């Protein structure tokens, strides 16, 4: 199980989800991805994307404008 950190600050919908999709395809089941984004729409987008793809949204934290999501690949 690998852990990958992705910084998508400065990107807006749909780019963070597209970039995450590309990165997660290269992983294997159980890999963890920590994504930081400052797009206010990222929180509902990542929740919907995980729901649609079956990947696991482990949690979301906020610090200032930054939103950090931790996702485990299915």
Where are these regions (language model features)?
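C-terminal structural segments of small proteins and small subunits
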Residues: 47-74
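A generic structural signal for beta-strand entry/edge sites
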Residues: 3, 32, 64-68
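Short amphipathic
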Residues: 2-9, 34
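Amphipathic, hydrophobic secondary-structure cores in small proteins
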Residues: 26-51
């Amino acid at each position: 199980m690998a852990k990958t950190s992705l910084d998508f600050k400065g990107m807006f919908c749909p780019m963070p989800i597209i970039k995450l999709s590309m990165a997660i395809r290269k992983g294997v089941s159980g890999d963890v991805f920590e994504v930081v984004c400052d797009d206010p729409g990222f929180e509902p987008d990542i929740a919907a994307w995980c729901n649609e793809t079956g990947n696991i949204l482990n949690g979301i934290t906020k610090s200032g404008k930054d939103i950090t999501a931790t996702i485990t690949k299915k």
